[in-house]
Amino acid sequence: MTRIAIVGASGRMGKVLVEAVCDNPDASLGAASVRVGSSLVGADAGEIAGLGKKGVACVDDLAQVMDDFDVIIDFTSPETTLELLALCRKEGKAIVIGTTGFSDQQKTLLAEAAQDCPVVFAPNMSVGVNLLLNILALTAKTLGDDYDVEVIEAHHRFKKDAPSGTALRLGEVVAEAMGRNLNECAVYGREGITGERDKKTIGFETIRAGDIVGEHTVMFATMGERIEITHKASSRMTFAKGAVKAALWLHGVAPGLYDMQDVLGLK
């Protein structure tokens, strides 16, 4: 039985993560945290998630309950994640990171921390999206430079970063398969008189509206035909179940930086 700590247990994703842990027979809810100074400190994490009492009182500092869990699941903010990584390095705990919006410098710090503790870092924990990555690599390699590539993503109005971490990862996979550097070929939105499309660019378009859980489409278009590969998530539980699967896989493995491709055996 793997004991899991949920960070941000009172948030939209946190509540779903608590439910996913409680629903998995191989996992148990070991700890739950909320914001520092929150009025929910001491409240039962199960009751916050609408599941009834689970016997786990929320804390605002996981360092207080280090003996109560084996793996952390975090879908909060880059700043919070880096603080948790420092704790994991010190205590030898494993962590599953679904947080997005990291800068290149923050990603470097994350990779350094993974030298001392096991880390699964993936912008999208769903099985479907991770299968999509493999499909995209094959498609991009086969089609090559004759096809224009556009990545279109849509999320709810509350999402703070754009493009989404998943969209950027989709773009990275396509760029790598085509022998390009995404940092050099990405175009984020278009406005005004832009001139003809540069053949080797990868375009990104972002939609933020309503309660859209997450939709991603990669378009490969040339003269005469267009291929669109799409993934649509209709529930956050899709991501939560993937995160719990990652936590179960991560428990007991050697320190290192892993992703969902490792968890799912797709590499």
From Swiss-Prot:
Keywords: Amino-acid biosynthesis, Cytoplasm, Diaminopimelate biosynthesis, Lysine biosynthesis, NAD, NADP, Oxidoreductase. One of its GO terms (cellular component) is cytosol. NADP(+) binds at residue 35. It comes from the Bacteria. CDD domains: DHDPR_N (cd02274). Signal peptide: none annotated. It holds the Pfam family DapB_C. It catalyses: (S)-2,3,4,5-tetrahydrodipicolinate + NAD(+) + H2O = (2S,4S)-4-hydroxy-2,3,4,5-tetrahydrodipicolinate + NADH + H(+); (S)-2,3,4,5-tetrahydrodipicolinate + NADP(+) + H2O = (2S,4S)-4-hydroxy-2,3,4,5-tetrahydrodipicolinate + NADPH + H(+). InterPro entries: DapB_C, DapB_N, DapB_N_CS, DHDPR_bac, NAD(P)-bd_dom_sf. (S)-2,3,4,5-tetrahydrodipicolinate binds at residues 156, 165-166. It is found in: Cytoplasm. GO terms for molecular function: 4-hydroxy-tetrahydrodipicolinate reductase; NAD binding; NADP binding; oxidoreductase activity, acting on CH or CH2 groups, NAD or NADP as acceptor. The keyword Cell membrane does not apply. Catalyzes the conversion of 4-hydroxy-tetrahydrodipicolinate (HTPA) to tetrahydrodipicolinate. Belongs to the DapB family. This is 4-hydroxy-tetrahydrodipicolinate reductase.
